[in-house]
Design a protein with these regions (language model features):
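Hydrophobic alpha-helical signal peptides and transmembrane signal-/tail-anchor segments
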Residues: 5-24
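Positively charged n-region of N-terminal signal peptides that target proteins for export
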Residues: 26, 31-35
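Bacterial N-terminal signal peptides
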Residues: 38-46
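Sec/Tat signal peptide C-region and signal peptidase I cleavage site
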Residues: 50-52
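Active-site-proximal helices and loops of the catalytic beta/alpha 8
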Residues: 54-70, 83-90, 101-125, 144-159, ...
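Aromatic- and acidic-residue-enriched carbohydrate-binding clefts of CAZyme catalytic domains
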Residues: 65-69, 105-143, 183-214
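Active-site mouth loops of central-metabolism enzymes
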Residues: 72-79, 213-224
Length: 504
């Protein structure tokens, strides 16, 4: 029977759309169900990964980025002493040496060379001129000879430089420096002879005197040019990098201006980003440079990091707390406590300042310092610095033989120090994971499935049982001959008190 026009209209425009709607609605509902199901599954999977993956901490680098260098701070060693011990330094696995300041400095106590007493270690932190050579460290020729010896062993020389201030005795400042900057008044900031009262006030912090030391007008182009000639000479003589003392006391472009300054451009000039009077630092990317930017309130860490690496002072304090209380959590060990990428941090257990100023770290034993060193050096990032304590020093006699010039004690070549230095280089490219014993007495730093460094912080023997990624089997520590067994993701061994181990 032929379709009536009305029937055709009702079927095509009413019933068919209804059926299509019902089918379409059903399809959309089904798709919606599967869509939300997929979201739930994805969330569950993500949660599972988060539980098992290491938490990304502030300052952490990407998993394939590693630092392999190590620095020996040859504190108060003369250039000749460093040269004579270069083979031992290289054999100990150190890739860099950091010297004390090489510039002409204040001569106090009649030229005495005791670290503290008839002479002072901090006199070489009081410049009178920016030329190479001083009575404590040695001559320019001796510096050149030291650098040549370092090159022979593949060791980079880092020089401690300090453009921020001069000696207290401004009358002793070299005439050549005075003339270069247009007179002594042009050498200092407007309030450069006034001591800082509030270290968190950036104008005071960067233009007044640290501890009362006269604050140099580092924005004066004449000074910048003079200082950069010193840097260039150090490089010509063989230096491969610098540690900038009191770096946070030199202003950044965003800091308030001193009345004598037109712009805060010291760091762009010092890092070769900008020329001064026709001079520009070349090959900046071939130099290792970091600044002493001690952490505190209102310190512009990220802005400083645009120019150089930075010190991880808070992390150093945390490590000293760990070795003092002899307990740690993996979170305490892992957190760099810094806003800057860990690849740009210089780390330490102690520095010359923590040792000398109020002797904050000087009461820690050499063994405790060594245990802390193994922890920071086994890690994937940061560039660790080992402070060479005075030879003959004890926890009752911090200055030991008390002489500027001779080498420090032999801890830098302790077998445990050597083992972890070499482990660090061998683990290049291996991602770290950190574990601790249930009671916190043991810290383990794993690097991929290639090796582990284990530290027993306690003063008792410990039966170790800790997670590992190493393949099943037995591993023998090269220093102590201790046998470790890995089975089903668990590493076991018996650890001696206050001892570190490296297995691979």
């Amino acid at each position: 029977m032929p379709w009536h026009p009305v029937s055709f209209f009702l079927c095509f425009f009413v019933f068919v759309p209804q059926r299509l709607y019902l089918y379409t609605h059903k399809i959309l509902y089904t798709m919606k169900y599967y869509f939300y199901s997929l979201i739930v599954i994805a969330l569950l999977l993500t949660a599972s990964v988060s539980i098992h993956a290491s938490k990304k901490l502030k300052g952490e680098a990407s998993c394939r980025t590693t630092n392999t260098e190590t620095i020996l701070h040859v504190w108060c060693w003369s250039f000749n002493t460093i040269r004579e011990n270069m083979k031992s330094i290289a054999d100990a696995g150190f890739t860099m040496v950091q010297t004390s300041p090489a510039n002409h400095c204040f001569i106090g106590d009649g030229g005495g060379k005791q670290i503290m007493g008839n002479g002072k270690w901090y006199y070489h932190y009081q410049p009178l001129d920016w030329t190479i050579g001083n009575y404590q460290m040695g001559t320019r020729d001796e510096f050149i000879a030291m650098c040549a010896e370092a090159k022979k062993y593949g060791v980079r020389v880092i020089v401690d430089v300090l453009p921020n201030h001069t000696a207290f005795d401004t009358s002793a400042v070299a005439q050549g420096l005075r003339d270069a900057v247009g007179g002594i008044d042009n050498l200092y900031h407007a309030n450069g002879l006034v001591e800082i009262k509030d270290y968190n006030d950036r104008l005071q912090c960067t233009t007044s005197g640290v501890g009362g030391l006269p604050d140099v007008n580092t924005e004066n182009p004449d000074f910048q040019y003079y200082y950069m000639q010193y840097v260039a000479d150090l490089i010509r003589c063989g230096a491969g990098g610098f540690r900038y003392d009191t770096a946070k006391h030199i202003g950044l472009p965003s800091d308030p201006l001193d009345p004598k300054s037109k712009k805060n451009d010291f760091w762009p000039v010092a890092m070769g980003m900008k020329s001064v009077k026709g001079f520009r630092l070349e090959n900046r990317d071939q130099l290792f440079i970091y600044g002493e930017v001690l952490q505190d309130r209102n310190v512009k860490e990220k802005e400083y990091s645009k120019y150089m690496g930075l010190t991880a002072s808070n992390y150093g304090h945390e490590i000293r707390q760990i070795i003092s209380k002899r307990k740690a959590t993996s979170a305490e060990v892992a957190d760099w406590q810094h806003s800057v990428s860990a690849t740009k941090l210089t780390t330490w257990v102690e520095s010359h300042d923590t040792y000398c100023n109020a002797n904050e770290s000087a009461t820690l034993t050499d063994t405790q310092i060594r245990l802390g060193w193994v922890i920071i050096t086994a890690r994937q990032n940061g560039t660790p610095l080992f402070f060479s304590r005075p030879d003959g020093s004890t926890r009752e006699n911090f200055w030991g033989n008390n002489l500027i010039g001779p080498k420090g004690n032999d801890e830098f070549r302790n077998p445990e120090v050597v083992a972890v230095n070499k482990f660090r280089k061998e683990m290049d490219g291996e991602k770290e994971y950190i574990g601790t014993a249930a009671d916190g007495s043991v810290v383990a730093i794993g690097r991929g499935d290639k090796g582990m460094a284990i530290v027993n912080l306690s003063q008792q023997e410990v039966a170790l049982s800790i997670a590992t990624k190493m393949a099943d089997g037995t591993y023998t520590d090269a220093v102590h001959g201790t046998v470790f067994t890995a089975a089903d993701g668990i590493l076991t061994a018996t650890l001696a008190p206050e001892t570190s181990y490296v297995i691979k």
